[in-house]
């Protein structure tokens, strides 16, 4: 594709805050961190354009969060050789970045405000938050099981996306793929410290079971007071999913 499509249809998004504190952060609309997943057909160029357009209209400042190199673990867990998995992730994240940059430029945002998990490996705030997550993972069985459950869902979802039949998900597969979950969690509990912003909301298109448990104080780790989570869904997609559910 050589250039941006100049005409886009009007679209509406519905935003739902995870907690009352998240709602209060949303009302102030200072900053949002838009999460974009790799290997997810939802995140087409048009969808990213619409989503970032909505975010830019709602918030004073918009940043975008893309996957890091840990995404290769998910592919490797499904049998892709490590080198090939890393190449596929680099290609996919580059595609996501390109679409996000175009959308930010088109809507008057900052095209440099795009980050991957891996960008913060040497960031002190990220390191501390990740250490907190890893400590809970190894010391609290119920938290570890919740993380591995998310890992299982990701493996099954990716397998379904490539029409791969999964008879079972082994422990080795889970332990390999869970690195992605661990790498992402610091942005769920304390992204403002990492990004050096006053407060933010991590925005994604669906509820996060692990995040709901964290917000319900089921584990030692918790969301910082200036951190929130926002479920952002496109009206057209919601109506389509509702129609499929009612017909099915």
UniProtKB/Swiss-Prot annotation:
- What general EC class does the enzyme of this chain belong to? transferase
State where substrate binds: 40, 180-184, 204, 209-210
Question: Positions of the site: Could be involved in aa-tRNA binding(Leu) binding?
Answer: 180
Q: Does the keyword Iron apply?
A: no
Q: Which reaction does it catalyse?
A: 2 L-leucyl-tRNA(Leu) = cyclo(L-leucyl-L-leucyl) + 2 tRNA(Leu) + 2 H(+)
Q: Where is this site: Could be involved in aa-tRNA binding?
A: 88, 98
Q: Name one Pfam family in it.
A: CDPS
**Its Enzyme Commission number?**
2.3.2.22
Active site annotation, chain numbering: 37 (nucleophile)
Gene Ontology process terms (BP): pigment biosynthetic process
Q: What GO molecular function terms would the record report?
A: aminoacyltransferase activity
Keyword annotations for this protein, in alphabetical order, are: Transferase
Q: Where is this site: Could have a critical role in the catalytic mechanism?
A: 40, 184
Q: Does the keyword section mention Nucleotide-binding?
A: no
Query: Its domain of life?
Result: Bacteria
Q: How does it assemble?
A: Monomer.
Homology family: Belongs to the CDPS family.
- What job does the chain carry out? Involved in the biosynthesis of pulcherrimin, a red extracellular pigment. It uses activated amino acids in the form of aminoacyl-tRNAs (aa-tRNAs) as substrates to catalyze the ATP-independent formation of cyclodipeptides which are intermediates in diketopiperazine (DKP) biosynthetic pathways. Catalyzes the formation of cyclo(L-Leu-L-Leu) (cLL) from L-leucyl-tRNA(Leu). Can also incorporate various nonpolar residues, such as L-phenylalanine, L-leucine and methionine, into cyclodipeptides.
Instruction: Report the protein name in the record.
Output: Cyclo(L-leucyl-L-leucyl) synthase
Q: What is the scientific name of the source organism?
A: Bacillus subtilis (strain 168)
């Amino acid at each position: 594709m050589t250039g941006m499509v100049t005409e886009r249809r009007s679209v509406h998004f519905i935003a739902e805050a995870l907690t009352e504190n998240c709602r209060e952060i949303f009302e102030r609309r200072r900053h949002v961190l838009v999460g974009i997943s790799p290997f997810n057909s939802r995140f087409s160029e048009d969808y990213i354009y619409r989503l970032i357009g909505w975010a830019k209209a709602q918030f004073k400042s918009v940043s975008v969060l893309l996957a890091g190199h840990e995404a290769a673990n998910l592919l490797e867990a499904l049998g892709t050789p490590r080198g090939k998995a890393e190449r596929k992730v680099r290609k996919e994240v580059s595609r996501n970045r390109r679409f996000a940059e175009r959308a930010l430029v088109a809507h008057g945002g900052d095209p440099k405000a795009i980050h991957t998990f891996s960008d913060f490996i040497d960031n002190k705030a990220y390191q501390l938050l990740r250490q907190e997550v890893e400590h809970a993972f190894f010391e609290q069985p119920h938290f570890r099981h919740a993380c591995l459950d998310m890992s299982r869902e990701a493996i099954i979802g990716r397998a379904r996306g490539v029409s791969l039949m999964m008879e079972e998900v082994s422990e080795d597969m889970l332990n390999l793929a869970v690195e992605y979950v661990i790498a992402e969690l610091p942005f769920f509990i304390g992204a403002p410290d990492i990004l050096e912003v006053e407060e933010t909301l991590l925005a994604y298109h669906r509820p996060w079971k692990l995040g709901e448990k964290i917000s319900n104080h089921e584990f030692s780790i918790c969301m910082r007071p200036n951190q929130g989570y926002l479920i952002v869904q496109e009206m057209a997609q919601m109506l389509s999913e509702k129609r499929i559910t009612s017909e099915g």
